[in-house]
Amino acid sequence: MLQAASALRHAKRILVITGAGLSADSGLPTYRGVGGLYNGETEDGLPIEMALSGPMLRRDPELCWKYIAELGKACLGGEPNVAHYAIAQLQRIKPECWVLTQNVDGYHRAAGSPPERLIEIHGQLSPLFCQSCAAQDPQLSEHLQRPLPPLCRLCGGILRPPVVLFQEMLPERALETLYEQLATGYDAVLSIGTTASFPYIHEPVIRTRVSGGFTAEINPQPTDHSAQMDVFLQCRAAHVMAELISHI
């Protein structure tokens, strides 16, 4: 841990990559899926990749929204944990520290991470927006208590959250921001609670290693990336992040 703290202390530009494991201590499941909520088939007999997809939202919005609502209720029912607050503290200490998250729970924002240095690569749950007229609606929690799918109060169109469902493209602006920052480079990358091998996850790690920077991972179990890291801390982020930041 002291090696990681020393490297982060001396680094100017830092990227913190976070996945579903970070929010496990907030009570959210870590199964694979949008927001890390599902694994395998749904109770409707469909793979979650089909039920919670862009095409399904268009074809059968009521079915798709059934699972969006479960995701929404899980996220709204939790709150940021000590690791989210520690990351926000690191961003206050280091004005060029960025967060790249796969999570859609909004906990980084709630914990105080500055939105201008937060890349939510899978989007976020709110505000909802109308697929017909694009009007925004901030009342996610209220809609989850009503019949689904939620409808636009202006035109009656079907609302949706700005999350990336299965078979949908990543948000263009988030990708642009990520690769703009990657072009500048990072002195250190800290990966927390993610097992994903998507290019936008492992590319920052590889680029930073190649350029001579420092890489570290915090995860309860080793991942495909662990052996390539300078430091691997096998634990939950909530158990170590506050202490790690206290040494910076």
Swiss-Prot record:
NAD(+) binds at residues 19-38, 102-105, 193-195, 219-221, 237. It catalyses: N(6)-acetyl-L-lysyl-[protein] + NAD(+) + H2O = 2''-O-acetyl-ADP-D-ribose + nicotinamide + L-lysyl-[protein]. Zn(2+) binds at C130, C133, C152, C155. It comes from the Bacteria. Coiled coil: none annotated. This is NAD-dependent protein deacylase 2. It is found in: Cytoplasm. InterPro entries: DHS-like_NAD/FAD-binding_dom (IPR029035), NAD-dep_sirtuin_deacylases (IPR050134), Sirtuin (IPR003000), Sirtuin_cat_small_dom_sf (IPR026591), Ssirtuin_cat_dom (IPR026590). PROSITE patterns: SIRTUIN (PS50305). One of its GO terms (cellular component) is cytoplasm. The keyword Magnesium does not apply. Its EC number is 2.3.1.286. The gene is cobB2. Binds 1 zinc ion per subunit. Keywords: Cytoplasm, Metal-binding, NAD, Transferase, Zinc. GO terms for molecular function: histone deacetylase activity, NAD-dependent; metal ion binding; NAD+ binding. Belongs to the sirtuin family. Class III subfamily. The keyword rRNA-binding does not apply. NAD-dependent protein deacetylase which modulates the activities of several proteins which are inactive in their acetylated form.
